[in-house]
């Protein structure tokens, strides 16, 4: 039966295809992130082994060090092909020699070279076992000279009348340098089925007791309750028979079947061994990731009678608590501790968006079967599967505590995985990894599976530091990370004297005629470490006055080179306690620096001089990660502050603004009037700090007031804080009293609350009582807007009747209605503040007694103005004329020309363009008005919104009432509803204006028509008069031409002849 076969009568099917197949399916969830700081696993001199493509080479790994002279790496490749006849991807285990020099290649270990065994059924030979796709090499474990490898998907054909093919699993044991092999298949029997051991998958997990006995996990037995099986390797070898396929070992031990409530628990998913009862007999630890109602738990099992002693239960359902288990004495108290992985743990920071990050639980043993509450380490990367693999490393950095490697194989955006190294301490594990390994060498395949398999606690290169193997089965590679020797440095800085008197100038400055105060500086160091060289060279770097910022004046310099920085080698012999080097340091002249109070910090930074290391296979030493490589010491300048050399100032500060209110939109020039004084001892490097609010800008210091001190002030910015800093003296001596004025502009007030704050304080470099009281000035912000409305009628009056024009009683075109009348209204915000929500309403003289007065054709807006649609605009659906261009008068109005129609705020000011008495005023009190309602948007100071109403005087209405003068009045009003600020003014602007159009009558005129014959007669008479006049002028000789006298011509010719050229 295949793994997906239907379940028996005791519950639902829960197939288990090992983390092997699950891992292959989960490869789409890999993560990777950059490495953090590196500690002592070497990432440069890696030894990388490669296997056949697609073989999952690296799925399982282990060290094989049978004796002091031999070392190798064992690598499982569960999908590899072998030389076994007719077997496809049966899997293999590779032997990879160490060191991997020259052309040395990994080779398959011949655990099994045979085909499937067969039996005769009804005269035909049929296979009784199935080794293709059995995943041999999915687990590999070595103990001294013994090596065990398992195939958890090995299938067995039962001997029932109806045969079934069950994944019972099998293992092979190799001893004596792979010269002898034996098979161990504890779940293979003649009556295998899901209810029994048919789905056992023996070898799913694997470990050894310290005495060499074998521990095998079979999580599929008994309807996937799972079981754990132990046996002696010696018994397996001694009782093995290739032909007796169902032979049972006499000393074999197995956990028994449990009640049905334990189905689908997966006992044996992971196994380990440790001592927890206080005797010399190790116990068995087994992971059960789906037990306890899917919360998962780990059990400690008695190795003698296979009874359950104690459980650790998971905290979250489906977290797969127990996926991995590791036993290690992390805190080095002589008692074994238990680590449990739950790689599917979900972090529920927000219930709506949980993150699968994984967790590790460390149970520290206090005494026999008594453990502390677990220390929990939580992964940081979603779907990283933190805790999918764990490895006991031993004491990686030789600090006396064992360390742990944790695999995060599905980590990072590039899906390359990583391995985190956690160092142990007396309380458990450090909460942050000391090193993060990333699979750059395995980057050509995605996912690479880097970190899915780990193995440590073996020193393959014999340098007294344990090493680590990391498998990346997705890319078919395995890497050996070797631990680097750790060098611990004890460094010291010695200064003499530590208090420097500037007056005691005992050192002659080279290349100068000046003397200076000075002191001696001694740099000393010693080294310790396991397996380090006898001579260690440190590159030492000394920084003088190191707390001064970059670019600041260093108060001290080395006497021999006038520099504040020095790098030099420090050669240390391992046998000697300390080795030292001496220097002389001098102080600059006190006129060159201000700071006399802060300590002169001398810092020493050191590193290993890697140029002294030999090139070769050996890894280079590294400095201890947990020891700071920076040492500092401080010297002090002697100041005149009494016997204790300690100045205690008493700084006082007061301030007030010259105005207590600023207006939004205005320029808002503001001055802060400040008083600073010192009523104590000298304040060194005393400075006034004024924190500038984001709404304000610094203008400068007030210099026109003789009562103010003209201090030196400058604008500075630290991070995002803007400030003005004024120098008050160095020192600001006792009794100092300064007054000064600082000017600011406050232009940016639109997006702030209704006040701004200026924070002020005096600060000095004194150690005790260095600062003054803190002063905070609050200045209120208000909004003020002056709003006006103005308007015009064009034309201001209409004269009736219109010459040669008569209105139509039922007009169809606009021109047939009457004269054009336009009213234009402008809402203008003088400012300075902004208005954001205003209602503008117009009462329009529309009709009286069902007769139209001013008939509207069109409403036009300019600016942030939107009017509501009105059905009474052109209700007769008269065809409108093309809208004419604005007249010069209207254009001038739109350019904000001075118009006599002007109202501000609440005033109502009516101005008549023309008065003719007596004229009857038609307004909204005695006629029917059309209401036009408009919403005005945001108007900054100086901006306007314009409304233009185009209408026609309904001439028919007025021609029926000849000689009666009228004044048609429209009323426009506004009300500001809101300003765009958090707090609104107590009173918002409003106002109105009346615009009139006069209708007057012309004086009657009498018209005369001239007959045509009169016109013709007048023309003929005109022509006759012209002819008589012309004749008279001709008779008088007016048209005769006047000729010049003859003698004049003779004289002219004579003059011409006289002009003969000379010979």
Swiss-Prot record:
Record's subcellular location: Membrane; Cell membrane
Coiled-coil portions: none
Gene Ontology CC entries for this record: apical part of cell; cell surface; dendritic spine membrane; endoplasmic reticulum; external side of plasma membrane; focal adhesion; glutamatergic synapse; integrin alpha8-beta1 complex
Which GO BP terms, alphabetically? cell adhesion mediated by integrin; cell projection organization; cell-cell adhesion; cell-matrix adhesion; establishment of protein localization; extracellular matrix organization; inner ear morphogenesis; integrin-mediated signaling pathway
List ligand-binding residues for Ca(2+) 2: 329, 331, 333, 335, 337
Q: Which residues are glycosylated?
A: 81, 122, 177, 239, 302, 311, 504, 601, 605, 719, 737, 753, 780, 896, 923, 1005
**Residue ranges, Extracellular side:** 39-1012
Taxonomically, which superkingdom? Eukaryota
Query: Which molecular-function annotation in GO is an example for this chain?
Result: integrin binding
Question: Where does the UniProt annotation place the signal sequence?
Answer: 1-38
- Per the record, what ranges lie on the membrane's Cytoplasmic side? 1034-1063
Q: What is the annotated quaternary arrangement, including any partners?
A: Heterodimer of an alpha and a beta subunit. The alpha subunit is composed of a heavy and a light chain linked by a disulfide bond. Alpha-8 associates with beta-1.
Task: State what this protein does.
Answer: Integrin alpha-8/beta-1 functions in the genesis of kidney and probably of other organs by regulating the recruitment of mesenchymal cells into epithelial structures. It recognizes the sequence R-G-D in a wide array of ligands including TNC, FN1, SPP1 TGFB1, TGFB3 and VTN. NPNT is probably its functional ligand in kidney genesis. Neuronal receptor for TNC it mediates cell-cell interactions and regulates neurite outgrowth of sensory and motor neurons.
Protein name, UniProt field: Integrin alpha-8
**Taxonomic source organism:** Homo sapiens (Human)
Q: What gene name is listed for this protein?
A: ITGA8
């Amino acid at each position: 039966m295949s793994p997906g076969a239907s379940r028996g009568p005791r519950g639902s099917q829960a197939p288990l295809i090992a983390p092997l197949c699950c891992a292959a399916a989960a490869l789409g969830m890999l993560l990777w992130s950059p490495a953090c700081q590196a500690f002592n696993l070497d990432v440069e001199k890696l030894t990388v082994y490669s296997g056949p493509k697609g073989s999952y080479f690296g799925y399982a790994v282990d060290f094989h060090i049978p004796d002091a002279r031999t070392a190798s790496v064992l690598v499982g490749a569960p999908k590899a092909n072998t030389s076994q006849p007719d077997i496809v991807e049966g899997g293999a285990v590779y032997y990879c020699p160490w060191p991997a020099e020259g052309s040395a290649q990994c080779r398959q270990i011949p655990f099994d070279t045979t085909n499937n065994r067969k039996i005769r059924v009804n005269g035909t030979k049929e296979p009784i076992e199935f080794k293709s796709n059995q995943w041999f090499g999915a687990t590999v474990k070595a103990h001294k000279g013994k090596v065990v490898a398992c195939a958890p998907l090995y299938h067995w054909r039962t001997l029932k009348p109806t045969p079934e093919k069950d994944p019972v699993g099998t293992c092979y044991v190799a001893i004596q340098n792979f010269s002898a092999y034996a098979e161990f298949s504890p779940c293979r029997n003649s009556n295998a089925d899901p209810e029994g051991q048919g789905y056992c998958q023996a070898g799913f997990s694997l470990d050894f007791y310290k005495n060499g006995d074998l521990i095998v996990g079979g999580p599929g037995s008994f309807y996937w309750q799972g079981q754990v099986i132990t046996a002696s390797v010696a018994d397996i070898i001694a009782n093995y028979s290739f032909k007796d396929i169902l032979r049972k070992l006499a000393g074999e031990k197995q956990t028994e079947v449990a009640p049905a409530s334990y189905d689908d628990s997966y006992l044996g998913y992971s196994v380990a061994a440790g001592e927890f009862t206080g005797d010399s007999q190790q116990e068995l630890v087994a992971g059960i990731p789906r037990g306890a109602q899917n919360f998962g738990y780990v059990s400690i099992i008695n190795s003698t009678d296979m009874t359950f002693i104690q459980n650790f239960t998971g905290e979250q359902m489906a977290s797969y608590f127990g996926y991995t288990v590791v036993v290690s004495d992390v805190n080095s108290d002589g008692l074994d501790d238990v680590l449990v992985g739950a790689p599917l743990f979900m972090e529920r920071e927000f219930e709506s968006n949980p993150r699968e990050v994984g967790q590790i639980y460390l149970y520290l043993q206090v005494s026999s079967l008594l453990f502390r509450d677990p220390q929990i380490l939580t992964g940081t990367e979603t779907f990283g599967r933190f805790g999918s693999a764990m490895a006991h490393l031993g004491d990686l950095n030789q600090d006396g505590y064992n360390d742990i490697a944790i695999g995060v194989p599905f980590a990072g955006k590039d899906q390359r995985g990583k391995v985190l190294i956690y160092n142990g301490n007396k309380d458990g594990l450090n909460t942050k990894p000391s090193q993060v390994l990333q699979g750059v060498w395995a980057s050509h395949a995605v996912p690479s599976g880097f970190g899915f398999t780990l193995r440590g606690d073996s020193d393959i290169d014999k340098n007294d530091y344990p090493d680590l193997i990391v498998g990346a089965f997705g890319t078919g590679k395995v890497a050996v990370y070797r631990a680097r020797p750790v060098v611990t440095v004890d460094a010291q800085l010695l200064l003499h004297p530590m208090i420097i008197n500037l007056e005691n100038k005992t050192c002659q400055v080279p290349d100068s005629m000046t003397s200076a105060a000075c002191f001696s500086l001694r740099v000393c160091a010693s080294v310790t470490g396991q397996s380090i060289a006898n001579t260690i060279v440190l590159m030492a770097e000394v920084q003088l006055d190191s707390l001064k910022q970059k670019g600041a004046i260093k108060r001290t310099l080395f006497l021999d080179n006038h520099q504040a920085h020095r790098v030099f080698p420090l050669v240390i012999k391992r046998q000697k306690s300390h080795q030292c080097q001496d220097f002389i340091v001098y102080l600059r002249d006190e006129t060159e620096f201000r700071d006399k109070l802060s300590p002169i910090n001398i810092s020493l930074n050191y590193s290993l001089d890697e140029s002294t290391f030999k090139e070769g296979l050996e890894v280079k030493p590294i400095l201890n990660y947990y020891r700071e490589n920076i040492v500092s010491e401080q010297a002090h300048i002697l100041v005149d502050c009494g016997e204790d050399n300690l100045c205690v100032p008493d700084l006082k500060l007061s301030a007030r603004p010259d105005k207590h209110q600023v207006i939004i939109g205005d320029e808002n020039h503001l001055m802060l009037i400040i008083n600073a004084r010192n009523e104590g001892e000298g304040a060194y490097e005393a400075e006034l700090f004024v924190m500038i609010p984001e709404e304000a800008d610094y203008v400068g210091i007030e210099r026109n007031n003789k009562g103010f001190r003209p201090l030196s002030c400058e604008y500075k910015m630290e991070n995002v804080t803007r400030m003005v800093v004024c120098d008050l003296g160095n020192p600001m001596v006792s009794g100092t009293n300064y007054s000064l004025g600082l000017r600011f502009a406050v232009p940016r007030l639109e997006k702030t609350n209704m006040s701004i704050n200026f924070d002020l304080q005096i600060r000095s470099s004194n150690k005790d009582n260095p600062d003054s009281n803190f002063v905070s000035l609050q200045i209120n912000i208000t909004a003020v807007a002056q709003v006006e409305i103005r308007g015009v009628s064009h034309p201001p009056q209409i004269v009736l009747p219109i010459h040669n024009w008569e209105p139509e009683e039922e007009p169809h075109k606009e021109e047939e209605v009457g004269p054009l009348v336009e009213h234009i209204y402008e809402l203008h915000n003088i400012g300075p503040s902004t208005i954001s929500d205003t209602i503008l309403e117009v009462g329009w003289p529309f009709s009286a007694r069902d007769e139209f007065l001013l008939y509207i054709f069109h409403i036009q807006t300019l600016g942030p103005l939107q009017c509501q649609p009105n059905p009474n605009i052109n209700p007769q659906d008269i065809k409108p004329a093309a809208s004419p261009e604005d007249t010069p008068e209207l254009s001038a109005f739109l350019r904000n020309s001075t118009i006599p129609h002007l109202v501000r705020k609440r005033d109502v000011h009516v101005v008549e363009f023309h008065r003719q008495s007596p004229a009857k005023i038609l307004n909204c009190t005695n006629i029917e008005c059309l209401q036009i309602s408009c919403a005005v948007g945001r108007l900054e100071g100086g901006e306007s919104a314009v409304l233009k109403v185009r209408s026609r005087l309904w001439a028919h209405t007025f021609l029926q009432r000849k000689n009666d003068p009228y004044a048609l009045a429209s009323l426009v009003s506004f009300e500001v509803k809101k300003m765009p600020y958090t707090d609104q003014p107590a009173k918002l602007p409003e106002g109105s204006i009346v615009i009139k159009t006069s209708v007057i009558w012309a004086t009657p005129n009498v018209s005369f028509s001239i007959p045509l014959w009169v016109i013709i007669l007048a023309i003929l008479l005109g022509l006759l008069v012209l002819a008589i006049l012309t004749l008279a002028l001709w008779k008088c000789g007016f048209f005769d031409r006047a000729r010049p006298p003859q003698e004049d011509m003779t004289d002219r010719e004579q003059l011409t002849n006289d002009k003969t050229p000379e010979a």
